[in-house]
Amino acid sequence: MKMMSVRCKLAQYLEDLEDVDLKKFKMHLEDYPPEKGCVPIPRGQMEKADHLDLATLMIDFNGEEKAWGMAVWIFAAINRRDLWEKAKKDQPEWNDACTSNLSMVCQEDSLEEEWIGLLGYLSRISICKKKKDYCKIYRRHVRSRFYSIKDRNARLGESVDLNRRYTQLQLVKEHPSKQEREHELLTIGRTKMWDRPMSSLKLELLFEPEDEHLEPVHTVVFQGAAGIGKTILARKIMLDWALGKLFKDKFDYLFFIHCREVSLRAPKSLADLIISCWPDPNPPVCKILCKPSRILFLMDGFDELQGAFDEHIEEVCTDWQKAVRGDILLSSLIRKKLLPKASLLITTRPVALEKLQHLLDHPRHVEILGFSEAKRKEYFFKYFSNELQAREAFRLIQENEILFTMCFIPLVCWIVCTGLKQQMETGKSLAQTSKTTTAVYVFFLSSLLQSRGGIEEHLFSAYLPGLCSLAADGIWNQKILFEECDLRKHGLQKTDVSAFLRMNVFQKEVDCERFYSFSHMTFQEFFAAMYYLLEEEEEGVTVRKGPEGCSDLLNRDVKVLLENYGKFEKGYLIFVVRFLFGLVNQERTSYLEKKLSCKISQQVRLELLKWIEVKAKAKKLQRQPSQLELFYCLYEMQEEDFVQSAMGHFPKIEINLSTRMDHVVSSFCIKNCHRVKTLSLGFLHNSPKEEEEEKRGSQPLDQVQCVFPDPHVACSSRLVNCCLTSSFCRGLFSSLSTNQSLTELDLSDNTLGDPGMRVLCEALQHPGCNIQRLWLGRCGLTHQCCFNISSVLSSSQKLVELDLSDNALGDFGVRLLCVGLKHLLCNLQKLWLVSCCLTSACCQDLALVLSSNHSLTRLYIGENALGDSGVQVLCEKMKDPQCNLQKLGLVNSGLTSLCCSALTSVLKTNQNLTHLYLRSNALGDMGLKLLCEGLLHPDCKLQMLELDNCSLTSHSCWDLSTILTHNQSLRKLNLSNNDLGDLCVVTLCEVLKQQGCLLQSLQLGEMYLNCETKRTLEALQEEKPELTVVFEISW
């Protein structure tokens, strides 16, 4: 009889796996340790493979011996000991000479067809080798083309190594919302880095499905604000693929397409496009396109296409050899009319998302959020070759909160670094670095002029009016690419533009020599704002007019600009107006007039003030700008006198804050507002406390409104997860002493820190402060601020509720707090010290508080390593008749049955205790038996007992039944996450049916119960409707 082959044997083992185990096997196979020297199997081939196919793939990729070893290892990993033992005994005898290594021939480029046996595989080896040769040639070309980038201010011939300069960007999978489609530059300080948590995404998983049952992703859209790093990320993807670091087994070819270049070229075919990417004029186009599923087209800058994708354009191209207009060619690829099986990666600004969305079928949207705080630091250290300079520059920017926030945008980070380096090289102080967008751009422009010398500066001043009018014309007409005729229309010549190229004001397109653009959209907005400020001298009289030949919209009347603000499609005017406010700052105006030898209008200041006055008094701002946007404009100016005049017109302020920048901006404006009577602030991600639904009152979670007496201003009571820092809190806390209506303050999830807490404590001790409830969870506090908190506790009788959870106070910090808690004037009723790094050492101090503080009724000290000894110390004082504690939380405190005797003594003697939380402590059946003694005592008044996840088994059934039968006070019992078993639960149901059982709520979540027990529970619920039974069956 012929021996069974290894492949058949392996397939036979895999057939023993149920569907769930087979999925686990594939998952472990995908994550098989690379150090074991095995070749990974492409996910696309593996996910649809059945038992036989999977066995074939494993052997074809790694040979029989390694495949068998992999299977044995994975059987153990998925807890199939039966198969593991059987496979070890049944292991074939290997012949090293016959070990299959054929799969290594095409290791760089995986075969996409199913493997159909060794004979078919051998017949394709020669084809695979040829394909590999073409791939190698093209990869080398891509490496050469993309290994370096040219810095924006680089001299001729200078470039920067992309791998050395590139800093990782934050990528998240999100569906674009209306807010995300607003003008991209408004995302400065508004990204969701400090908002709700998001699912980050790795580049290698871009085209992988979120669920293994779903089809692979074929279209990915990178969206992000201008300057956020879309293009450099696209180039990095090209380089990593060429280096074999990315998509190695997924794509044979990646083609980089500049959307704006393609749309401006003469009609070309897809074949022409590939030829333009190839290192020589004769690429194997037919062979490349014969497998479109192995091709990725990377389209950079969809939003920069000229006139493409209008709704009325229906012309498409389905022939890869047919020459068509560039926009039609790209449209056909995107709409999957041409090469429908090819994959696409498209980068775009948010403003073009709506237009793009209608063309795509099930795309994956990935948002580029820019740099995290850690990556900003990394970027500084990569930009500055000198580590001391990098450290000094980063420290300076980090101290400047608003500018540090703006640096999450890579372009702004580059501008800041460039400006700082320029100052360092000239030996000037870095203290002049400003904190507004306008100041950054003015400083950068100044740096450019200084680096070019006096003659260039004089030329720039002469051509500045034309440059500004060109920018404004482009803004009004939504135009970013200009031809030479556009330059001439605004008094500019081609020779003038070459000077701007050197100064980095303009960027000449590499392959589109007849077209010019500002190097970045924000530069265009900046110069457009200057257009409304510049005055011209004409026969001794100062006039303000637009260049000859420009449209009527280009008159210099700023009223026209402001009237259209908010109405203009896509919000292109938003940043122009912000820059306008920043440029009319008097010091900045004087600086620009001197530096650029120009005359700047003072009339614009009055027009801006009138505009703010009208908007401030409007009953409801149905259109842009919102009040917060007006505040951003005022903040950009940085003139307190002007801001005070403007804010004097606000009778009511209603704004929603979500970022650090929002807080800084609003704080700057609100502190200069002396007439506002009502302030309503909305915040993101407010969440109620787990245990006390009533403690929040009736205020809505998303907005709290406070009315303040003139002339002082305060803030809303709810500031959860708003990235507050001490700079914002000073303005907030100063109002606590005068606002009589503010009684609740929630500062949870803010980087308050000990310095901010000290500022808050000063305000809380003021006689005029009426704060009663204060929540400070996760505020970065340590023992260093506990003395200040203790002083508040000993001086303020108004404070009745304090939450300090998730702060590393430690035992020493609690000892300091206890000094205040024991003070006669302390009136605190509720205290949370959950997860505060406490041990049994602090329990003696807390015990003294329990016996001396008669107001404290609720103490939550769970998630701390108190241990049995610590709780025993607490219990000694809780037996004191003077102890008024009603609720005690000891969740996950490292307790065992050893502390249950002490707890039983408390239950027998303390009739005040009504709630006891013992969740996630290994009390066991013995612990419950000891507690049962106290619960059956006639003096026990406990109403709520939480024993979730306390290691109880069916042996506790008798004690639980006894408690339910005889305890007359217990109303709520949580037994979830315990292994009670079906029989015990059915027994409890019978007890609960009795008339003498007064329990109102029973929780049995996460129990392994059968269907019969489930029906018994449902029947109990119907028979006794006053009893609530919560059960979540785990199978």
From Swiss-Prot:
What residues does the Glycyl lysine isopeptide (Lys-Gly) (interchain with G-Cter in ubiquitin) crosslink join? 322, 428, 689, 877, 972
Q: Where is the lipid attached (S-palmitoyl cysteine)?
A: 128, 836-837, 843, 957
Q: Tell me which UniProt keywords the record has, alphabetically.
A: Activator, ATP-binding, Cytoplasm, Cytoskeleton, Disulfide bond, Endoplasmic reticulum, Golgi apparatus, Hydrolase, Immunity, Inflammasome, Inflammatory response, Innate immunity, Isopeptide bond, Leucine-rich repeat, Lipoprotein, Membrane, Mitochondrion, Nucleotide-binding, Nucleus, Palmitate, Phosphoprotein, Repeat, Secreted, Transcription, Transcription regulation, Ubl conjugation
Domain named Pyrin: residues? 1-93
Gene Ontology CC annotation, any one: canonical inflammasome complex
Q: Specify where the region named Required for binding to phosphatidylinositol 4-phosphate (PtdIns4P) lies, as residue ranges.
A: 129-132
Q: Which ranges does the UniProt record give for the LRR repeats?
A: 741-761, 770-791, 798-818, 827-848, 855-875, 884-905, 912-932, 941-962, 969-990
Note the CDD domains from the entry.
LRR_RI, Pyrin_NALPs
Superkingdom of the organism of origin: Eukaryota
What InterPro entries is this protein classified in?
DAPIN (IPR004020), DEATH-like_dom_sf (IPR011029), Leu-rich_rpt (IPR001611), LRR_dom_sf (IPR032675), NACHT-assoc (IPR029495), NACHT_NTPase (IPR007111), NLRP_HD2 (IPR041267), NLRP_innate_immun_reg (IPR050637)
| Record's subcellular location | Cytoplasm, Cytosol; Inflammasome; Cytoplasm, Cytoskeleton, Microtubule organizing center; Golgi apparatus membrane
Motif annotated as KFERQ-like motif 3, chain positions = 797-801
Motif (KFERQ-like motif 4) spans which residues?
990-994
Q: Which Pfam families match?
A: FISNA, LRR_6, NACHT, NLRC4_HD2, NOD2_WH, PYRIN
The residue ranges of the NACHT domain are 218-534
Activity regulation per the record? Under resting conditions, NLRP3 binds ADP and is autoinhibited. Inactive NLRP3 forms homodecameric double-ring cages that hide pyrin domains within NACHT-LRR rings to avoid premature activation. NLRP3 activation stimuli include extracellular ATP, nigericin, reactive oxygen species, crystals of monosodium urate or cholesterol, amyloid-beta fibers, environmental or industrial particles and nanoparticles, such as asbestos, silica, aluminum salts, cytosolic dsRNA, etc. Almost all stimuli trigger intracellular K(+) efflux.
Q: List the disulfide bonds.
A: 8-106
In short, the EC number is: 3.6.4.-
Subunit details: Sensor component of NLRP3 inflammasomes; inflammasomes are supramolecular complexes that assemble in the cytosol in response to pathogens and other damage-associated signals and play critical roles in innate immunity and inflammation. The core of NLRP3 inflammasomes consists of a signal sensor component (NLRP3), an adapter (PYCARD/ASC), which recruits an effector pro-inflammatory caspase (CASP1 and, possibly, CASP4 and CASP5). Homodecamer; inactive NLRP3 forms homodecameric double-ring cages that hide pyrin domains within NACHT-LRR rings to avoid premature activation.
State the family named in the UniProt similarity comment for this chain: Belongs to the NLRP family.
Q: What does this protein do?
A: Sensor component of the NLRP3 inflammasome, which mediates inflammasome activation in response to defects in membrane integrity, leading to secretion of inflammatory cytokines IL1B and IL18 and pyroptosis. In response to pathogens and other damage-associated signals that affect the integrity of membranes, initiates the formation of the inflammasome polymeric complex composed of NLRP3, CASP1 and PYCARD/ASC. Independently of inflammasome activation, regulates the differentiation of T helper 2 (Th2) cells and has a role in Th2 cell-dependent asthma and tumor growth. During Th2 differentiation, required for optimal IRF4 binding to IL4 promoter and for IRF4-dependent IL4 transcription. Binds to the consensus DNA sequence 5'-GRRGGNRGAG-3'. May also participate in the transcription of IL5, IL13, GATA3, CCR3, CCR4 and MAF.
The entry's protein name is NACHT, LRR and PYD domains-containing protein 3
The organism encoding this protein is Rattus norvegicus
Q: Which gene encodes it?
A: Nlrp3
